[in-house]
């Protein structure tokens, strides 16, 4: 009863748990396809240039120019070759390449990888200036923790998905903050642009504005619903999503409550504006949270090997949630 | 009548006689480049900016110690072709976009190794126009290719090939050392 005092509208007792996502399946598949290709780029970044990242070679014609024969060259002769071009020259060549080709260039040889690993070089500054909205670049706090242009560009590719979102949510012009409109008797969610299936990934999530009766952060497959009628902890209500309701600190999965988190007596309530870090370890199939850099314990384990997206669901009108991808968290 | 003829002669003089500067490559070949063409290279322009025109004829050639003769010849040929043109100004498109004219496309249809030498020479001589075209040509070879394809196109050895080459070089050095040791061992027995 006390929880309802802050609500202007009393929620119905009946809830429609079978509400379907407003997205069309064909639309989802279209959105999914480019993500598949881009995911390997970030995985390579996280894993430090793994050999398994090499794609298959296609039989198509390689170049309109004649290909010089692969002559063995003594490693001691300092001849100019593509792999020994000066850094300034490499940067000029890479400025003509789109992002996908920059990934191929990073995997070609060490010197090219070194040139493109300088995360504040002109190439990444250019791409950052063109890809990110002005509202994100000019916000001094939004991406403050990301130290390089390349990391900020990467965060953009993981931000909230403008085409995979409940109809009552919209994404602000900075591209990283979702805003829930004041609609009665509705639970509304959003997914990130890109899912993850390998490696360890961290997302910084900040809830601005009141929580209401439901404020869930967690992970979801692409099949999890993002909308339903009523005020429901939608994230975690089925086997496609896992959620942590910040209002009562309860973990949810497959419609079942998994207990209070952090697992202690009277865990502290979420303070609006605190930074929550969601960490998904796909290799050991666990997910957990940190709050203001403090580890809170394992939240979910035995997560199936699916492609998982960061997600939130909200019920309070005009509340906002910001999510910034930070890559692999620093351990220890 | 004679005054008119004299005026015409005076007017024609500057057009007929461009100042020619001499540059020397690292293999001793001397080339000439006109004062208009020199402006395409910021490095050369800075070198000659303090030279009085009347002293040019008696000057020694400007030594360019890290560019070979054939590459320097190509750079000068390109500069002569584009003399009088403004230096390119970078737009801020991403990826960078530039259109390579037909003459320059044909000019740059050369072996990849020569193209890379040319680009490095442009980097040193600071010829931004040819630098842009050369880098664009290399980038066009790279667009849409996988890493394996890039290694084939640009003759970049993989780590395994590098290790194999180093191992072969090491074995060769050891074999030479062994042969020398045997030779040294043979000589004392002969002297005995």
Swiss-Prot record, chain A:
Oligomer and partners: Component of an SCF (SKP1-CUL1-F-box protein) E3 ubiquitin ligase complex composed of cul-1, fsn-1, rpm-1 and skr-1. Interacts (via SPRY domain) with scd-2 (via cytoplasmic domain). Interacts (via SPRY domain) with convertase egl-3 (via C-terminus).
Function according to Swiss-Prot or TrEMBL: Component of a SCF (SKP1-CUL1-F-box protein) E3 ubiquitin ligase complex which is required for the restriction and/or maturation of synapses in GABAergic neuromuscular junction (NMJ) presynaptic neurons. Promotes NRJ synapse development and synaptic transmission by negatively regulating the daf-2/InsR pathway in muscles. By targeting convertase egl-3 for degradation, negatively modulates insulin-like protein ins-4 and ins-6 processing. May stabilize synapse formation by promoting the down-regulation of scd-2. Regulates axon termination in PLM and ALM neurons.
Expression by tissue: Expressed in GABAergic neuromuscular junctions (NMJs).
Encoding gene per record: fsn-1
Protein name: F-box/SPRY domain-containing protein 1
Domain of life: Eukaryota
Keywords, ordered alphabetically: Synapse, Ubl conjugation pathway
Pathway: Protein modification; protein ubiquitination
One Pfam family hit: SPRY
Primary location: other
Entries under Gene3D superfamilies matching the protein: 1.20.1280.50, 2.60.120.920
Phenotype when the gene is knocked out: Synaptic defects that include both overdevelopment and underdevelopment of presynaptic and postsynaptic termini. Abnormal morphology of cholinergic and GABAergic neuromuscular junctions (NMJs) characterized by uneven distribution of presynaptic markers snb-1 and unc-17 and post-synaptic markers GABA receptor unc-49 and AChR unc-38. Also, formation of abnormally large and small synapses. Frequency of spontaneous miniature synaptic release (mPSC) from cholinergic and GABAergic NMJs is reduced.
Residue ranges of every copy of the F-box domain listed in the record: 79-127
One GO cellular component term: neuron projection
Subcellular location: Synapse
Limits of the B30.2/SPRY domain: 138-330
């Amino acid at each position: 009863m006390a929880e309802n005092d802050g609500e202007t509208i009393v929620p119905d007792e009946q809830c429609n748990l079978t509400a379907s996502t407003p997205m069309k399946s064909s639309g989802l598949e279209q959105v999914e396809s480019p993500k598949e290709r881009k995911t390997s780029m970030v995985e390579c970044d996280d894993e430090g240039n793994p050999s398994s990242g090499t794609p298959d070679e296609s039989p198509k014609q390689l170049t309109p120019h004649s290909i010089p024969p692969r002559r063995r060259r003594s490693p001691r002769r300092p001849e100019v070759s593509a792999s020994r071009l000066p850094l300034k020259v490499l940067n000029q060549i890479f400025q003509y390449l789109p992002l996908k080709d920059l990934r191929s260039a990073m995997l070609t040889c060490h010197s090219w990888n070194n040139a493109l690993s300088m995360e504040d070089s002109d190439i990444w500054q250019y791409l950052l200036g063109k890809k990110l909205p002005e509202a994100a670049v000019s916000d001094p706090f939004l991406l403050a923790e990301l130290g390089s242009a390349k990391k900020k560009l990467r965060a953009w590719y993981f931000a909230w998905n403008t085409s995979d979102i409940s109809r009552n949510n919209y994404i602000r012009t900075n591209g990283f903050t979702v805003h829930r409109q004041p609609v009665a008797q509705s639970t509304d969610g959003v997914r990130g642009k890109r899912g993850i299936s390998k490696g360890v990934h961290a997302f910084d999530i900040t809830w601005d504005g009141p929580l209401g009766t439901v404020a869930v952060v967690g992970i979801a497959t692409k099949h999890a619903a993002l909308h339903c009628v009523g005020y429901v902890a939608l994230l975690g209500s089925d086997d496609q999503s896992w959620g942590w309701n910040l209002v009562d600190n309860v973990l949810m999965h497959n419609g079942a409550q998994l207990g209070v988190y952090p697992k202690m007596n009277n865990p502290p309530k979420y303070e609006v504006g605190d930074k929550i870090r969601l960490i998904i370890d796909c290799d050991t199939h666990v997910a957990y949270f940190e709050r203001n850099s403090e580890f809170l314990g394992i939240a979910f384990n035995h997560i199936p090997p699916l492609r998982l997206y960061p997600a939130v669901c909200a019920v309070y009108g005009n509340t906002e949630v910001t999510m910034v991808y930070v890559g692999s968290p620093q351990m220890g | 009548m004679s005054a008119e003829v004299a005026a015409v002669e005076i007017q024609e003089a500057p057009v007929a006689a461009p100042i020619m500067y001499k540059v020397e490559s690292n293999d001793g070949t001397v080339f000439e480049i006109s004062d208009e063409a020199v402006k395409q290279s910021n490095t050369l322009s800075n070198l000659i900016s303090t030279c009085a025109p009347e002293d040019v004829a008696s000057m020694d050639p400007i030594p360019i110690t890290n560019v070979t003769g054939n590459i320097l010849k190509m750079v000068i040929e390109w500069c002569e072709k584009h003399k009088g043109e403004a230096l390119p100004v970078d737009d801020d498109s991403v990826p960078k976009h530039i259109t390579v004219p037909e003459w320059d496309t044909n000019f740059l249809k050369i072996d990849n190794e020569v193209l890379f030498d040319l680009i490095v020479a442009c980097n040193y001589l600071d010829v931004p126009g040819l630098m842009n075209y050369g880098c664009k040509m290399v980038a066009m070879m790279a667009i849409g290719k996988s890493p394996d394809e890039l290694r084939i196109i640009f003759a970049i050895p993989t780590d395994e090939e590098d290790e194999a080459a180093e191992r072969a070089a090491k074995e060769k050095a050891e074999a030479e050392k062994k042969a020398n040791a045997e030779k040294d061992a043979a000589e004392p027995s002969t002297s005995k």
